[in-house]
A protein has these predicted regions:
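A structural signal for conserved, well-ordered secondary-structure elements
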Residues: 1-177
Length: 177
């Protein structure tokens, strides 16, 4: 961690992350009327942040203001893609065929949003990559981190959030039944 970030700033950043995670969890749980949506979204965001943080650790890059800005951007980008998928799951649940299982519904919902998620991630990645290649040196760290976060966020939105929600829904439904 770079010397520009004081101990107090690190503490404030950790508190801000914890508070924002709880608020996101509550908002998503309220919006989708199911706390499992919120939990799976926040866990996917934790995944994204940890992967990028691991890359920073492996690359021995210093954590500073650029890192914090990238993390906020990645979280915002990733939660947006996750909300799109959750919204489709909710819509499909309203019109669910009685013969269709919940697993099939989640898979269908992810499939319906897959192209949109990939296109959005790919176009954003291309633009950030161009900035990485052609931009000034001071942008390299920001754009590299953002590219990694875009890939990680797309992966977690498509491959983690829906299946994690389904798993929690299935597990907790059995306990309550």
């Amino acid at each position: 961690i770079s010397s520009t970030i004081s101990g107090e700033m690190k503490k404030d950043a950790i508190v801000a992350i914890a508070v924002s995670s709880v608020l996101m969890l509550l908002y998503i749980a309220f919006r989708f009327s199911d706390v499992k949506f919120g939990v799976s979204a926040v866990l996917a965001l934790v995944h994204d942040v940890l992967v990028v943080f691991a890359a920073y650790s492996i690359g021995t890059l210093s954590v500073g203001n650029t890192f914090i800005a990238c993390m906020l951007t990645i979280v915002g980008y990733s939660i947006n893609a996750t909300i799109i998928i959750f919204d489709r799951i909710r819509e499909n649940m309203r019109t669910q065929d009685s013969k269709e299982s919940l697993e099939e519904l989640v898979n269908k919902s992810i499939g319906q949003t897959f192209t949109r998620t990939i296109y959005t991630s790919l176009t954003t990645f291309i633009m950030v990559f161009v900035l990485f290649v052609m931009g000034v040196t001071s942008l390299k760290e920001f754009t590299f981190t953002l590219m990694l976060g875009i890939v990680c966020g797309a992966y977690s939105s498509v491959c983690i959030t829906g299946p994690l929600w389904y798993t929690m829904k299935k597990k907790f439904s059995k306990k309550n039944a």
